[in-house]
A protein has these predicted regions:
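Histidine-centered, transition-metal-coordinating active-site segments
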Residues: 1-86, 92-100, 108, 144-150, ...
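Basic, low-complexity intrinsically disordered segments
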Residues: 104
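Post-HEXXH active-site segment of zinc metalloproteases
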Residues: 109, 113, 124-143, 240-244
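Short active-site segment of divalent metal-dependent hydrolases/proteases
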Residues: 117-125, 229
Length: 304
């Protein structure tokens, strides 16, 4: 099926162009000067190095960032450089998120820092490795292992990079595996609340994680774009790995079947209902795509 790429309404596109040309930003954008760190005497915001730009650089120069390169996204044991690895996935999340964030007038550095760091604690062998480690940890300690929690542990405890609360929270709350009908930022987060959320993730596992909502709209955008980045690419990789013969079973009149169609059309659908809002509503079409089509069709074929 050949699907026409959706376009933004002309009035919406005109408004976005005007806002960008005039430098108009969203009133819901999280400002660099409001970043919170455990050590507020270090890593202060400046013109040369804005707060969240610092977070980006800290993550990029982290030794564990290099380990993205050969970590499994979905398919392990394939000697094929055309199959997506974790390193490409985080770049795709960053690119899609920043594109949406630019149209919304949000903080692109905060979006990028969350996106680049969101899987830095992910396991080898993808979610299969994550489940296995969690089983071992529960057997020995009664606690749960989850990659989002380990990602912030890497940044905040193992390497102690003084990453901002807003970046850490966005990473902790990023899990695209748990969809919500509404993404409304939980404003006013403190490190005390954040630390409590982390502990609940260890003790309650998925039950606690699925209740998490980012404290910034930037974090909400990244969380949704984590889904957008993999729902088409994972299927494309399944064809490359010859697990699927073609993508016809994913055909949809709403979003198409190919990765490029999905990213474009989901971005347009999302943008139509997101302009300068305090929340992101996942409308019935998005819910159908993510909660029904992807889960129902993909899970019998392979596990993420």
């Amino acid at each position: 099926m050949s699907l026409k790429y959706h376009q933004l309404d002309s009035s919406v596109e005109k408004q976005i162009k005007e806002n960008i040309s005039k430098g108009i930003l969203s009133s819901y954008r999280f400002m660099d000067e409001n970043a919170v760190r455990r050590n507020m005497e270090k890593d202060k915001n400046s013109v040369l190095r804005p707060s969240f730009g610092r977070d980006i650089e800290k993550i990029l120069h982290l030794p564990l960032y290099n380990r993205y390169n050969d970590k499994t996204q979905v398919f392990s044991f394939y000697n094929n450089d055309d199959i997506t690895r974790r390193g490409l996935h985080v770049q795709l999340v960053s690119r899609i998120s920043r594109n949406i964030g630019r149209m919304l007038g949000l903080n692109l550095d905060l979006i990028e820092s969350i996106a680049l760091g969101h899987d830095v604690g992910h396991t080898p062998f993808g979610h299969a490795g994550e489940r296995y480690l969690s089983e071992l940890l529960q057997k020995e300690t009664g606690r749960h292992f989850n990659h989002n929690v380990h990602s912030i542990r890497v940044l905040d405890i193992l390497y102690r990079r003084n990453i901002s609360l807003q970046t850490l929270d966005g990473i902790l709350c990023h899990n695209g595996e748990f969809e919500l009908n509404e993404y409304r930022p939980q404003k006013g987060l403190t490190f005390e609340q954040y630390d409590n959320n982390v502990e609940l993730c260890y003790t309650e596992g998925g039950e606690a994680i699925k209740k998490l909502v980012p404290s910034t709209l930037e974090g909400c955008v990244v969380r949704i774009c984590d889904i957008l980045a993999y729902i088409g690419k994972d299927r494309q990789d399944a064809i490359t790995a010859k697990i699927l013969s073609d993508d016809s079973i994913f055909s949809s009149e709403f979003i198409g079947s190919k990765n490029a169609e999905m990213i474009n059309n989901l971005t347009v659908i999302l943008k139509r209902g997101m302009m300068f809002e305090t929340k992101i509503l996942k409308n019935s079409i998005i819910y159908f795509i993510v909660a029904t089509q992807v889960r129902k069709l993909a899970n019998p074929l392979f596990m993420r």
